C-alpha cells in the first residue's frame, strides 16, 4: 500500500513540475484499518497540499477503514480537521461497508 502512495506521489510531483496551471483532483481509496497506513495517507495529503494548495483531495473509506471516521474510534481527527481547513479535502464513507459493519451514519464524525 505504501508503494502505491509513493508511486502516486512521484507521479503527482512529476506532473506538478511540468504543468503548474492544471487543477488536480486526487481520490485515495482506503480499505486498511492499519493506523500506519491511514497516517501515511494523511501525510501524503499534506505533501500534495504543500506542492499544490488548490488541489482537490478526497479519501473514500471502505471495509475496515471506515473506522477512521467513527466517533470514539478515531486516531487522526485533529490532523483531518487541519487538512480540511487548509484545502479542498473531503472524507467519504462507503454505505455498503457501513451496513456490513453495522455502523450508523450518526456514529460518524462531522468530517464524513
Task: Give names to the regions the model predicted.
Residues 20-112:
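Secreted/extracellular ectodomain signature
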Amino acid at each position: 500500500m505504501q508503494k502505491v502512495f509513493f508511486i502516486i506521489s512521484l507521479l503527482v510531483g512529476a506532473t506538478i513540475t511540468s504543468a503548474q496551471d492544471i487543477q488536480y483532483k486526487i481520490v485515495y481509496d482506503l480499505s486498511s484499518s492499519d493506523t500506519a497506513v491511514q497516517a501515511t495517507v494523511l501525510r501524503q495529503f499534506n505533501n500534495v497540499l504543500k506542492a499544490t494548495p488548490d488541489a482537490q483531495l478526497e479519501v473514500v473509506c471502505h471495509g475496515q477503514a471506515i473506522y477512521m471516521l467513527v466517533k470514539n474510534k478515531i486516531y487522526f481527527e485533529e490532523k483531518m480537521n487541519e487538512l480540511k481547513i487548509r484545502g479542498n479535502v473531503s472524507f467519504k464513507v462507503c454505505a455498503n461497508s457501513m451496513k456490513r459493519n453495522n455502523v450508523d451514519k450518526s456514529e460518524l464524525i462531522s468530517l464524513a
